[in-house]
Amino acid sequence: MADSGPAGGAALAAPAPGPGSGGAGPRVYFQSPPGAAGEGPGGADDEGPVRRQGKVTVKYDRKELRKRLNLEEWILEQLTRLYDCQEEEIPELEIDVDELLDMESDDTRAARVKELLVDCYKPTEAFISGLLDKIRGMQKLSTPQKK
């Protein structure tokens, strides 16, 4: 497996900014190991670990990632309505879009989602129909695209 950061540093995820703060989401920082370059001429500073922002790159199409992110946000919004609760209180369930895309037909996809929502007391047909409409034409993100 590849190193988690430059010079053997550990990757740290900063918490996501709160809603309405205008932030772009969580940021990834790399913590430099003691004595690493960039800590000053005297070696380790007394101020604790040095945090520098790292860039994360992937080989996925940016447009496809944006569609996936929008879909995941829509799913969370719909689940909070279906379960009539806050996002943190939604029962543990995972709607795997790639798994749904692997299935042969909309009927099998609908059956799988209905199976996942078995504990929901509200009608789920509109959610399932909307989900199937939104994933139609999407690409799987399990494997990076070759360039």
UniProtKB/Swiss-Prot annotation:
Primary localization: cytoplasm
Biased composition range(s): Low complexity: 1-15
Modification comment: Phosphorylated primarily on Thr-57 by PKC (in vitro). An unknown Ser is also phosphorylated by PKC (in vitro).
A GO CC term assigned to this protein in UniProt: cytoplasm
Keyword set includes Acetylation: yes
Pfam families: PP1_inhibitor (PF05361)
Taxonomy, superkingdom: Eukaryota
Entry-linked InterPro entries: CPI-17, CPI-17_sf
MF GO annotations: protein serine/threonine phosphatase inhibitor activity
Record-listed Phosphotyrosine modification sites: Y29
Keywords: Acetylation, Coiled coil, Cytoplasm, Phosphoprotein, Protein phosphatase inhibitor
Any one Gene Ontology BP term: innate immune response
Name of this chain's protein: Protein phosphatase 1 regulatory subunit 14B
Species whose genome carries this gene: Sus scrofa (Pig)
